[in-house]
Amino acid sequence: MGLAAVKTRQKFGLDPRNTAWSNDQSRFGHKHLMRFGWQPGQGLGTQPVQSMKTHIKVSIKDDNLGLGAKLKKNKGDKIDEFDNGECAGLDVFQRILGRLNGKETEVNKELEIQRKDKILNGKWGVHFVKGDTLASTWDPKTKKLLSYSQMEKDSSSDEESDDDEDEKKKHKIEKKEAKKSKKRKRDSESDSESKKKKKSKKDKKEKKSKKDKKNKKEKESKKDKKSKHKKDKKQEIRTASIESSTSATSIPESVSTRLSVRSKWIKQKRAAVMDSKALNEIFMVTGN
């Protein structure tokens, strides 16, 4: 016996077949259809035989394209007039038209080629594009191929337009340079004027400062002179008062002899009072 394989447990949900939503009769869609006469078990359609009983699959829109954009894109990719794109039954219609016009064999051959191409492209999915179509020979305005003569004319016109653009660019560059030179001249002139103004202002300030200094010196000298004059006057007044006092003291005094004796006695008394030893001797006070 060999080894047992790895056990994998498969879990089933509550609704593995996803039929709970279709069997739920309380939903809005179910009730809305029943109002229009639909009953459970019936299909969708006007005739009961051809009605659809399968669930409708909704394709998820994962782009920003509008309605009909894919059909228009497929129409633009047509190879020839017999390319039917995604329209079913068009090949049969083309065969009928071929029979009526007497071109049944040609139409059948073209349709067989398309059928084989679809089979091959379905297997390998390769689409070959001719090298001529890669060139810019398609005119979107007229929706036709451009001839080489027209391409040469267009190229010459493009060259002329390039030359005109170069000339315009040069002219613009020259204008810009002229504007820059004018701006520089204006700036230089304005700078020179501003410098002159600054110099004149400095000169005026210096002159004012010199004048102020002179005025200050003159005021100080005047103040000094006034103060000196006042001092001289005061000294003269003092000298005059001193002279008058000296003259008054120099007058001869006729002091009487009695006053002179009294003054001497007073002086002696004061000297004795001021001297402590003399007082002790007078009052007979000993040091013991």
From Swiss-Prot:
A Pfam family of this chain: G-patch
Residue ranges, compositional bias (Acidic residues): 157-166
G-patch domain span: 25-72
GO terms of molecular function: enzyme activator activity; nucleic acid binding; telomerase inhibitor activity
Basic residues bias spans: 169-185, 195-214
Residue ranges the record marks as coiled coil: none
Gene Ontology CC: nucleolus; nucleoplasm; small-subunit processome
GO biological process annotation, one example: negative regulation of telomere maintenance via telomerase
Subcellular location: Nucleus, Nucleolus
Protein function: Involved in rRNA-processing at A0, A1 and A2 sites and negatively regulates telomerase.
Protein's name according to its UniProt entry: Protein PXR1
Organism whose genome encodes this protein: Candida glabrata (strain ATCC 2001 / BCRC 20586 / JCM 3761 / NBRC 0622 / NRRL Y-65 / CBS 138)
